[in-house]
Amino acid sequence: MKPLYQELPFADDNYINFYREDLPHFIVPWHYHPEIEIMCIEKGWGTRFVGDHIGGYEEGDVCMMGPQLPHEWRNDKEFFDSDSGLRATCHCVYFRKELFEGILIRLPEMANIRELIERSRRGIKFTGESRERIARYIRRTFLSLIHI
């Protein structure tokens, strides 16, 4: 199946965009976009499709997808039952690729960031302390933004 191109809404001068989705089930089909994405699953479970990988996902999962990497999170069947009461909730952070271009990213101090971006081109599932810290930071940042 050919992935759909998704255009993400960014204000002209923003390089980072925070987004929260809370629905009976995830609705975005197999798609790709030029932005780097970090997705934190708050509620829900099902099947994750990232590039050529297929695997399960569950609450608490944190993944990073690089630019142009096709992906989809598909909830299990019970989420599509109208009286299930289940919710699919996630927090996403999108980074414009231009943020990681130019002289700054070439600095020696940015070597770990360059490696992370390169690895994200095939998708990264964070585990352990990294997963916990990233999820906590995304939730805290999102909450601070809605209270501005």
Locate each region found by the language model:
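Aromatic/histidine-rich interaction motifs
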Residues: L107-R136
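Flexible, active-site-adjacent loop/turn segments at secondary-structure boundaries
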Residues: K2-L8, N14, F26-W30, E98, ...
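Charge-rich, low-complexity amphipathic helices
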Residues: C63, S82, R122, A135-R139
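Conserved small/polar residues in nucleotide/adenosyl-binding loops
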Residues: I146-I148
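Regular secondary-structure segments
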Residues: E42, R114, A135-L143
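N-terminal regulatory/effector-sensing and dimerization cores
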Residues: Y15-E115
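A broad detector of the eukaryotic-type serine/threonine protein kinase catalytic domain
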Residues: E98-F100, E118, R122, R139-L143
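A short, N-terminal "cap"/entry segment at the start of jelly-roll beta-barrel domains
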Residues: M1-D12, S130-R136, R140
